[in-house]
Regions:
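Hydrophobic/aromatic-rich core segments of domains that either
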Residues: 25, 136, 140-145, 150-156, ...
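Secondary-structure boundary elements
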Residues: 27-183, 216, 401, 410-576, ...
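Short, ordered, surface-exposed loop/turn motifs in non-cytosolic proteins
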Residues: 299-318, 339-341, 543-546, 641-672, ...
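Structured interaction patches on ligand/partner-binding surfaces of diverse proteins
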Residues: 350-372, 704-732
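Short active-site neighborhood of thiol/selenol oxidoreductases, capturing the structured segment around
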Residues: 760-789, 802-806
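Short, internal strand/loop/helix patches
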Residues: 818-853
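A short, hydrophobic beta-strand/beta-hairpin element that forms part of a small beta-sheet core
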Residues: 851-870
């Protein structure tokens, strides 16, 4: 039987080769020529490391040769250095197989297959063999479906594998997300795109860099069926396409983009063309839009060609760049965006200028480069986001019921898998048997989720007391996401770190710790131990600046070689002797740590530093030597407003450094556990003053209004070396009093979750104000809302009024896990909306539909509503507190 299977496989392969052996991957000769030219340029850029040897394989078919050339012509450096050619060939053959075996394979246009099926890379994730693994699981599940229904089915499969959970910025590979059983939206959408492409369905990740009306961003998926692109929420199956919880927020968006692998010649607006991808703008698919032209002039009124023009949205208390253009010879550039406000920041040669642009109201804007570092200014800016204009497809009650039934089954499948992760009891017993710290081990193994066996195996190899202590410390130094996907050989490698510093803290954080920035962890210490001579190691340890000079001389920096990818591994940089600046910095720190020299990338400023007993020494590769920065102090006075006594970094204010080019670089302070009210605040950072490099900065503050608008202020600051700069941190206020915006019957009944009794809101809450929330269990907008409320637990408990949280039905109540939101105020009452309170709110407040959740109102027993929020809103807790403090 096995021999027959092998013979069948060989026959299938021979038939496939015969069918496409001499066929072209690119039938357009002119496009094929352009790809060949781009490929030759890529090869010329990377002469070292023997990175393209797979193309010398004489057995490659014409199709495979061209497909490989297409991939290598445009793939970022990390994909060339960190994955062998055989990996890319395997994926080409897997995509061919899907095209042959799936019923829609022959109907996919060549250009869509080339750009949206063949490429393995979706965004900046780590690559893996997901295409092969997923195809085996999905092929029989979708092969008898229409293309439209297959897209829906693949998303149901993804929901079996993962649900939403926020995490850090490093993007997990698709298989790591499946192993973990959750991921943030960027990881869920990467998973879904990978799964769709595995069965030959064109798919792409759509990303709004920042929402205009709330402090967050989001990613979802578009898939192609029957001649058009449809959108869907990844791992959030709906009965139909073009439906998701984000329909309404997306209609308020100002920019939606996707990165298309290679040179793409589609119909969408092109934002930029880079050596690795074409960035397109798909905002027209989601919201009403308008075009605007920007003219940049100097102070004499002359057009400025090749000026950098950044289109910025207020989000997370900074003006974040969502699109960058350069002016033409006439000093002009343009953008299509949603009908709201952006800040346009133009710069060239150290001069800069800025102005607000209201898309839909202004067709043209002139920005004058009338400022430079050192100028003093304070500017108030009122930002208005686009209005909501969502169009939702119809879903029948039968479709909704069937979808809900399937979601419940999928939840049970995923939960059964998660139930096989190690339990706390088993983790503690393991720690006891191996003489390890029980509390630490239990926390680590539970955090590792599907990767716990790797972590446990590593722990079994810790034999001595010192190694046990050091090994646990190593696991505590790396991130929670690292625990979920790190390999055993990586952990073993870094446990063998050289000890050259007597400072134990430096050794733990800046030598043994494998984590430098946002890179995937690799066993680079063993690698460097093999490729760097003993004599060079001794020289670099004695004089680390010699190592700086070597890197500056031997590692070529190309800012465009790795766009759209994670950092190149240290091993990859060594092989190619080429890197983007960030990968070069990680390479240097990794190289230093491999020799026992403490080094880091400063989290706030992004500067590379050597760590000595005398402090941090900045590394300057351009000067190839020490660069001791001149420092000063910045302090700010703050007069509390009624609803805010201690502004938070990223929520209410940020600080950015003005670069020599005239643009802004955010100081990236630790966010802390923001869900629990952590992170940097005015009192911890600026009340007594903080040390900064001397130079010019911009302080941005902003008050987010319930409407989504912002009252912002920008203030320029100059920090002098050895001096102290004092400024004011001003939170602008909306002086209008809280207004009655609707009515709601406080005698409305609900069923209490505890006891199952029907009770009116008046009975449950007593006379006065109260909050009612209608929840969408396990939906991302509701999860965000509950975490926001948890972060302001103390304020809401101090207020003392009841928060009635209602589930739409008993089934939804059964899915809710109170332990996931243990930080909610003690004034919460849970219930079930058996009397359709949601419909009453929707009708009275003129909301569009009741199934867009969550819905929150603040009302009183005189039946007056003073606050309403529906759907996706970041900072809900703060908005609630701001409103109740104004009552």
């Amino acid at each position: 039987m096995r021999r027959a299977t092998q013979l069948f496989g060989i026959c299938w392969l021979l038939c496939l080769l015969a069918a496409c052996g001499e066929s072209h991957f690119m039938t357009d000769a002119s496009y094929r020529l352009r790809v060949e030219q781009d490929f030759q340029q890529k090869k010329a850029l990377m002469p070292q490391g023997e990175l393209f040897t797979i193309l010398d394989d004489a057995s490659l078919s014409t199709y495979e040769q061209e497909a490989l050339e297409f991939l290598y012509a445009y793939m970022p450096l990390a994909d060339i250095t960190d994955y062998p050619g055989e990996f890319h060939l395997m994926n080409i053959r897997a995509s061919q197989r899907a095209a042959e075996e799936m019923p829609w394979g022959k109907t996919i246009p060549e250009d869509l297959f080339r750009h949206f099926v063949l490429p393995v890379r979706v965004n900046n994730e780590q690559l893996d063999s997901a295409r092969v693994v997923f195809y085996k699981e999905l092929k029989d599940r979708v092969k008898s479906l229409s293309l439209y229904d297959a897209i829906l089915e693949v998303n149901h499969w993804c929901h079996e594998k993962a649900v939403y959970m926020p995490s850090d910025a490093r993007t997990s590979s698709p298989l790591a997300t499946v192993s973990t059983a959750y991921g943030r939206c960027g990881e869920e959408s990467t998973l879904l795109v990978a799964a769709l492409r595995s069965v030959g369905i064109p798919a792409r990740q759509v990303y709004t860099p920042r929402w205009a009306h709330t402090d967050d961003n989001h990613a979802w998926v578009e898939a192609w069926a029957d001649g058009k692109w449809h959108f869907l929420g990844a791992c959030e199956p709906e009965p139909v396409l073009d439906l998701g919880w984000f329909n309404a927020p997306a209609s308020r968006g100002m920019l939606m983009h996707t990165k298309v692998f290679g040179r793409y010649e589609g119909k969408e607006e092109v934002m930029s063309v880079n050596p690795t991808y074409t960035e397109i703008n798909v905002i027209d698919n989601y919201a009403p839009t308008a075009q605007a032209k920007v003219m940049v002039k100097d102070e004499a009124g002359n057009p400025v060609p090749d000026a950098c023009v950044e289109f910025k949205l207020y989000n997370y208390a900074e003006f974040y760049t969502v699109a960058t253009k350069h002016t033409d010879d006439g000093g002009v550039c343009g953008l299509t965006a949603g009908k709201g406000d952006m800040l346009v920041w133009a710069s060239k040669d150290g001069r800069f200028g800025f102005s607000k642009l209201s898309f839909g109201k202004q067709a043209e804007l002139t920005v004058t480069l009338d400022k430079e570092a050192g100028d003093s200014f304070t500017v108030d800016i009122d930002i208005v986001p686009p209005a909501e204009s969502a169009n939702l497809p119809d879903v029948t009650p039968e479709q909704r019921a069937e979808n809900d039934r399937r979601l419940a089954i999928e939840d049970s499948i995923r939960n059964a898998y998660v139930g096989k992760f190690i339990s706390e009891e088993a983790a503690r017993n393991f720690a006891r048997d191996y003489k390890l710290d029980r509390d630490a081990v239990a926390k680590i193994l539970i955090a590792a989720r599907g990767n716990y066996r790797v972590i446990r195996e590593f722990m079994t190899r810790l034999r001595s007391d010192n190694s046990r202590k050091g090994g646990i410390d190593l696991l505590q130094q790396i991130s929670a996401k690292d625990l979920r996907d790190v390999r055993l050989d990586v952990l073993i490698d870094h446990m063998q770190s050289r000890v050259r510093t007597t400072n134990a803290g430096y050794f733990r954080k800046y030598v043994r710790n494998p984590r430098v920035s946002n890179e995937m962890l690799t066993p680079y210490k063993t690698f460097f131990g093999k490729v760097i001579s003993k004599e060079d190691v001794e020289a670099y340890v004695a004089e680390p600046m010699k190592m700086v000079a070597w890197v500056a001389k031997n590692i070529q920096v190309n800012k465009e070689c790795n766009l759209g990818a994670p950092p190149v591994s240290p091993e990859g940089v060594w092989k190619a002797r080429l890197a983007d600046a960030h990968s070069r910095d990680i390479f240097f720190v990794s190289m230093a740590r491999s020799m026992g020299v403490p080094a880091r990338i400063d989290e706030v400023t992004g500067k590379v530093q050597l760590i000595t007993d005398d402090g941090a020494i900045d590394v300057n590769f351009e000067a190839a030597g020490r660069a001791p920065a001149q420092r000063g102090r910045l302090a700010a006075k703050y007069t509390p407003i009624q609803s805010l006594d201690n502004p938070k970094y990223y929520s209410h204010f940020t600080i950015s450094k003005v670069t020599p080019q005239g643009n802004l670089q955010l100081l990236s302070y630790d966010e802390g556990d923001t869900d629990m009210g952590g992170g940097v605040t005015w009192s911890s950072l600026l009340k007594e003053g903080t040390s900064l490099d001397a130079g010019d900065y911009i302080l941005v503050t902003g008050t987010r209004l319930a409407s989504g608008g912002v009252l912002a202020q920008m203030t320029s600051l100059n920090v002098k070396a050895g001096g102290r700069t004092e400024t004011k941190l001003v939170m602008r206020e909306n002086k209008d009093e809280v207004q009655v915006i609707g009515n709601f019957n406080s005698e409305s009944l609900f069923t209490t979750l505890e006891g199952g009794n029907k009770q009116s809101l008046l009975q449950a809450c007593g006379r006065g104000y109260f909050v009612v929330g209608i929840l969408g269990v396990n939906q991302e907008p509701t999860n965000h809302a509950l975490r926001d409320i948890s972060a302001l637990k103390a304020d809401l408990e101090k207020w003392g009024r009841k928060l009635v949280l209602l589930f739409p039905n008993q089934e939804q109540a059964g899915k809710y896990r109170a332990a996931d939101f243990s930080g909610l105020p003690n004034t919460v009452i849970y219930g079930i909306d058996t009397e359709d309170i949601a419909q009453q709110i929707v009708k009275n407040m003129k909301l569009k539909r009741k199934d867009t959740l969550p819905i929150f109102i603040i009302a009183d027993t005189f039946n007056r509503v003073v606050f309403v929020s529906q759907g996706y809103t970041i900072g809900l807790g703060e908005q609630l507190v701001k409103t109740v403090k104004g009552l």
